[in-house]
Amino acid sequence: MSIIFHEGSKTFHLFNEEISYIICVLSNGHIGNLYFGKKIHDREGFSYLIESKQRPMTACVYEGNRKYSLEHLKLEYPVYGTSDYRNPAVEILQENGSRISEFKYISHEITDGKPELAGLPATYVEEPEEAQTLCLRLKDEVTGIVLELLYSIFSGKGILARSARFINEGIAPVHLLNAMSLSLDLPDSDYVWMQFSGVWARERHIIERKLEQGIQAVGSIRGNSSHEHNPFIVLRRPSTTETSGEVMGFSLIYSGNHRMQAEVDTHNTTRVTTGINPQNFDWKLDCGESFQTPEAVVVFSNQGLNGMSQTFHKLYQKRLVRGYWRDRPRPVLNNNWEATYFDFTEDRLVEIAAKAKECGVELFVLDDGWFGKRSNDYTGLGDWVANKERLPFGIKGLADRIEEMGMKFGLWFEPEMVNKDSDLYRAHPDWILHAPQRASCHGRNQYVLDFSRKEVVDCIYDMMYKILSESKISYIKWDMNRSITECYSVALPADRQGEVFHRYILGVYDLYERLTTAFPQILFESCASGGGRFDPGMLYYAPQGWISDDTDAAERVRIQYGTSMCYPISSMGSHVSVVPNHQLNRITSLHTRANVAYFGTFGYELDLNKLTDEEIAEVKAQIIFMKEYRELIQFGNFYRLKSPFDGNETVWMTVSEDKRKALVFWYRERNVVNAEFTRVRLQGLDPDLIYKNEYNGTENYGDELMNLGLLTTDVTAGEPTNEDLPCTDYESRIYVLTAE
């Protein structure tokens, strides 16, 4: 790993064992991008990569020079309005109404390690030798705005982290209207665009299309990263598969409004930009003030989609997630929500918890309904004090009873929301986001607290701190059950209303940081009606997230498959729920529900007292299995083998670091009569080790399993005679492979 500056050619070469990233100072002082991809040899200069030719109908920078136009150069952080007609990375409104900027190189600094981003989540290092950072310092002489571009390259992996910082060293305030975290110009457009989109209960489905001339973009203006479009996109070559070929993944470490975009120009070059969504963004930068963008991470792999995903998994597991729970297997939990909804008493909860303890559950979680006058979703939000009618001895009394059983206790909060029927709202009706003289929309009968205001965040912190400090609480589920509307703060002046969305999410991060600092051993799980704010920004504070409110096993296969493109298995909240499923009314077998839920944090979303003795025996066996293999599942090397978006079967697997153990998950959506035999080539095994398949007792070398494949499909002849695999839909199996 190294960052080299060639003074003569003013070229920077950032490289490690896998990638090279080459940029240079162009003749006009702008920064140009020359190359990003597989590692290449270093040399004094790469000027031959600067493509500057005369073209018709082009605006040119220099008098008398018809070859130098920004429109046809690959730029590193393009500006608005000076001969580049593609979308810019930055747009600044000045006092005179101009939006023209010209940032030119003035200096740079190369340091070991990686700096923190004040008030924002970001990847980190524990030792300086893990990364090097380049800070390019540019300046717009007219406004006095200084732009710092940060690049951190990590040792050993194809990872580059980028962000930008603006400092107003001028004599007048300006307004940032657009400030991307990353802009990357690529020399061609021969890519397939992949996005991870959906809706509530159907998040992160894979959508693909070939890049064409024009703009392809996804984003959010909901105040959260959204169910609809995750802040993650992929560009892969058309021939790239899960196991081979070039691919780039772009991930934004941010939980608010975002935009992920690829623009192909008329000469088929591609510009990728990621960052805060410029819609409804307007940040006033007074003299002496600075603004830091969120961090974007780009990963390059020439080992296919699995190679890219594994790089993201390891980075986010080890250098984004922090604290006590980073490297610890997650406890098996039982959440009461789908078992009781709002209809519970303390004794009923203890009854559910007792059965869970009997089955081997380690953590009991009390969900919504424990506070204020919360008997439905119309009342109580914001009043974070125990409802003594339901919990006569408060949260402490219930937590003590759960602890006495030998289990840990967890609790649900929705800190950012309030009901109008609450003491908090009655005391502070101006604490919600709302536009004066206009009606306010509600979602789930609730309103959004103005977390851009410190006094609001302080109040919620004080209430949560009191509960957490007085009771034995080991886990917090932090929910957000609506998106933001009427994004206006009565505490800010008119010329700062464009800051509210970003200030809001900074307030959320501040509350998370204060709570995780005060209670470092509490396991936080983020949630937003399921997967509405499942993003890297949340992982910095909460090591795991509830990826979807849909707990149906068949739907979860698709959701978990898409989610795994970027996010590690240890981050995915996944539970076994009742049937018929509460979201789809679908019935799937208990073993399939568990087989799918294993590949996440694992738990139960039901009242185990309502299961039969046979089902209880199965649950006990499931929990024993999960406890034995959860470290392998949550922290092993994960491979996708067959996609649910491509056919009737889904296969994925996880392999231990020493390659001596592997679990293979096989799932069949629909039963097929008289089907062909199918084999799946496994990945990541040691070719020279012999693996015993615990399902059928067969033994095979790793190279056999990776080249000949594992036989997964039994043949159904039309009669229910196959004892190994029931002749039903939604069937699954786990293969345990152990090296002899």
Where are the regions that the model predicts?
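Polysaccharide-binding surfaces and accessory modules of carbohydrate-active proteins
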Residues: F5, S9-H13, E17, I31-E263, ...
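Conserved, mostly hydrophobic/aromatic
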Residues: E18, A164, G288, N334, ...
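Glycine-rich, aromatic-flanked loop segments that form ligand/cofactor-binding clefts
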Residues: S69-L117, E242-N257, Q261, V299-Y324, ...
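Short Pro-Gly-centered flexible turn/kink motifs
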Residues: S98-Y105, W283-N302, Y730-L737
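Carbohydrate-binding surface patches
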Residues: I233, E242, P644-P687
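Aromatic-lined carbohydrate-binding/catalytic grooves of carbohydrate-active enzymes
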Residues: W325-Y461, Y475
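Glycan-recognition surfaces
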Residues: N419-D458, H502-N609
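C-terminal beta-strand-rich structural cap/linker in extracellular carbohydrate-active enzymes
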Residues: D703-E740
